[in-house]
Amino acid sequence: SLMEVYLPPFYAATKAGTGSMMTAFNDIAGVPSTANEYLIDDVLRAEWGFDGMIVSDWNAVAELINHGVAETEEQAGKLALQAGVDMDMTSMVLPTKIKAAVQSDACLAHDLDAAVARILTTKERLGLFDTPMAYHDPEREKTTLLKDEFRRAARHAAVKSMVLLKNEKQTLPLSSSPQTIAVIGGLAEDKLTQLGSWRAQGKTDDVVSLLEGLQRNAPSGTTVTYAAGTHPSSEVRGAIQQAVDTAMDADQVLLVIGEDFDLSGEARSRSDIALPPSQSELAQAIFATGKPVTVILVTGRPLALED
């Protein structure tokens, strides 16, 4: 599964010319990614030919202690460097502890030299030796962020990544003939969730929600109605009946359910992979209408849809 399912996207990224990779927090077969020499040196570098820089995830070098594979920060830094990690993101283990590690193990100097060489090579490729402030031009933000080319690429990636789980009754594609389409579910207009749980500098003002996109692009003569019903993070159920009424007045129902940005993400995912109770109750009420329903699942991880 590792080679056939999980690694192919990363292999494709290396062949597309990516300049750096980041190790994950998790372990593979008991070995933390940040100390995984097999993944970094054997697979990524030797087998795939990647010659870029490897950076750890946030504080991941220090957290090798939490994984139980290192007792001290010096040991953690040594493990990461030997595995092929070049740059330590924020934990400051490599900058502060690696000198002592090299003094106690001279063989580590070779790994250190290789890491430094890869970092300097990356800087050279970026032109930072000639123009150190090249990426600090305030005008660059205005001309680069969200440019049309990047939006098109993001849209293309989103379209390619969508999965149609089943279409047994041939509900899709929806007819372009005049009709009423009811969009049900608070996630349909949740722009924060569209940005995701780790959205960096993303702004909701730049997001086109699912509901907005449908309203803007609906065929002539098609009416798009909306009812939130419930939201994944809300315990309020009072609006479910309004959603049912809206669905009953429609020809087709698009039911948008799942988890919002606060229920699925780094260090915040629920322990249960079933739908949040409010979402399950909304779905059952809408299915009971007997209307043709298309479920649009919004989630940052796999969910069990047993109901």
Predicted regions and their residues:
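Glycoside hydrolase catalytic-domain context in secreted enzymes
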Residues: 1-307
